Amino acid sequence: MSRRGTAEEKTAKSDPIYRNRLVNMLVNRILKHGKKSLAYQIIYRAVKKIQQKTETNPLSVLRQAIRGVTPNIAVKARRVGGSTHQVPIEIGSTQGKALAIRWLLGASRKRPGRNMAFKLSSELVDAAKGSGDAIRKKEETHRMAEANRAFAHFR
């Protein structure tokens, strides 16, 4: 039996302006080289641009985008008898949100455009509407899981 105590699960903190955990998760994923103030600037500019584009609550657009991109199921490589199978596994809500944020940021980095705030706002608006690169990534993941459904018993 382990002598070490079980680690407490950390709860996500909320950002100073919107008091929203999703915004803080987004900030922590966009962060590079420890420059958190720059990450906050990028996010807040993107939120302002969403407000101008859609003329609705930008946080609801953000929530809708993340909800649309969050996958329910993914595939995991599993080695069975010398061959590697892609085994479909269910994803929890926290891990799903983390994946969705990662995909949204990856898709917005690939976008052509002036700056990161502009690209991120465009990607979030597209994802909320049900289009964009991040949505395509989710659909591709679900297709992979559906195609490899026969290996679900290897879990």
Swiss-Prot record:
One MF annotation (Gene Ontology) recorded for this entry: structural constituent of ribosome
UniProt main location, coarse: plastid
Keyword Iron-sulfur among UniProt keywords: no
One GO term of the biological process aspect: translation
Entries under InterPro entries matching the protein: Ribosomal_uS7, Ribosomal_uS7_bac/org-type, Ribosomal_uS7_CS, Ribosomal_uS7_dom, Ribosomal_uS7_dom_sf
Gene Ontology CC entries for this record: chloroplast; small ribosomal subunit
Pfam family, one: Ribosomal_S7
Regions crossing the membrane: none
Key words of the record: Chloroplast, Plastid, Ribonucleoprotein, Ribosomal protein, RNA-binding, rRNA-binding
Domain of life: Eukaryota
Location of this chain's protein in the cell: Plastid, Chloroplast
Reported function: One of the primary rRNA binding proteins, it binds directly to 16S rRNA where it nucleates assembly of the head domain of the 30S subunit.
PANTHER family in alphabetical order: RIBOSOMAL PROTEIN S7 (PTHR11205)
Family as reported in the entry's similarity comment: Belongs to the universal ribosomal protein uS7 family.
Quaternary structure annotation from Swiss-Prot or TrEMBL: Part of the 30S ribosomal subunit.
Protein name: Small ribosomal subunit protein uS7c
UniProt organism field: Cabomba caroliniana
Gene from which this protein is expressed: rps7
